[in-house]
Design a protein with these regions (language model features):
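Nucleotidyltransferase catalytic core that binds NTPs
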Residues: 1-163
Length: 163
């Protein structure tokens, strides 16, 4: 099995929950590629480049973590990068049902890739990028939900949307 793993997501924006999963994956694999998946049917608050920049800042010090962006099938991306694993964080059973279906699909499309599920820490079970954005837009404090190094960047963008 390849010791390369992919941590895919929209990361709009990256949260401490995402960072926890990325850090744990970095301890399990030789190389972890955090891939910002783009979807033309969605309207993210941050551009793909901004999300990549925030992830890079948040992952500073994790020497085996790399950041990339991709629009297309995750199974194809895994094959292009010779990744043997897709790492996904799970918050609740509702996450599992969707992610299990995606794991089976990715395995069908790329038999060389396995999906590894990491359960989130209890303190992050409720945390989502959508929740962080809503709190920030309403002027709430998001410090405990996002990495310190990108806090101001997120606040500045989302509070501008509010005004």
């Amino acid at each position: 099995m390849s010791r390369v793993a992919i941590c895919p997501g929209s990361f709009d924006p990256v949260t401490v929950g995402h960072l926890d999963v990325i850090t744990r994956a970095a301890n399990m694999f030789d190389k972890v590629i955090v891939v910002v998946m783009t979807n033309s049917s969605k309207s993210p608050s941050f551009s793909a480049e901004e999300r990549m920049s925030m992830i890079t800042k948040a992952c500073e010090g994790l020497d085996n973590v790399y950041v990339d962006c991709y629009e297309g099938l995750l199974a194809e991306y895994a094959a292009m990068r010779d990744a043997g694993a897709i790492v996904k964080g799970l918050r609740a059973m509702s996450d599992f049902e969707y992610e299990f279906q995606m794991a089976l699909t990715n395995k069908k499309l790329n038999p060389n890739v396995e999906t590894v599920f990491l359960t989130t820490k209890a303190e992050n079970m409720y945390l989502s990028s959508s929740m962080v954005k809503e709190i920030a837009r309403m002027g709430g404090d998001i410090r405990e939900f996002v990495p310190d190094v990108i806090h101001n960047e997120i606040i500045n963008r989302l509070q501008k949307e509010r005004n």
